């Protein structure tokens, strides 16, 4: 028997014949990988605060030329920010961040371009992390919604009363 089910979303008008939406299968298969991504950020509020600060610093570096003292200060802020970020991350993400970020030469003052590149790289990595977390959370939400809908559909078929007798279905009949 073939059953037509609506996916419940009014904006895409998709009807699945056969009972299971292939989009939900993909969500369920990837759920274990994506849920682990949300566990990799141990202190999300701290990571968000530092990420926002780093992004603001990048905008400042782009906006005005920096003198030697400000470039030294920004180099120190960059190194401190990375250490603080690592405190809020699980070991897997710490290792990835360590591989991607190269320390500045302590003997020389970094140029404006070096600082911009380092800050942009860090901002890009953080934005990728945030997008990955958002995607994982969305996938979890979709999987939970699909599971709830399956539970609702299995509860009582339309037109069946409490005692198992067929009653009137819902809706208007002409």
From Swiss-Prot:
Keywords assigned: Proteasome
Any one of the GO CC terms: plasma membrane
Taxonomy, superkingdom: Bacteria
Pfam families xref list: BPA (PF10759)
Compositional bias ranges of the Gly residues kind: 161-174
InterPro entries named among the record's database cross-references: Proteasome_act
Region (Disordered): 153-174
One annotated GO molecular function: proteasome binding
Location of the motif HbYX motif: 172-174
Any GO BP annotation: positive regulation of proteasomal protein catabolic process
Recorded family membership: Belongs to the Bpa family.
Job of this protein: Interacts with the core proteasome alpha-subunit (PrcA) through its C-terminal hydrophobic-tyrosine-X motif (HbYX motif). Interaction of Bpa with the proteasome stimulates proteasomal peptidase and casein degradation activity, which suggests Bpa could play a role in the removal of non-native or damaged proteins by influencing the conformation of the proteasome complex upon interaction. Can inhibit degradation of Pup-tagged substrates in vitro by competing with Mpa for association with the proteasome.
Known partners and oligomeric status: Forms a homooligomeric, either hexameric or heptameric, ring-like structure which stacks co-axially with the proteasomal alpha-rings.
Protein name as it appears in the record: Bacterial proteasome activator
Native source species: Mycobacterium tuberculosis (strain ATCC 25618 / H37Rv)
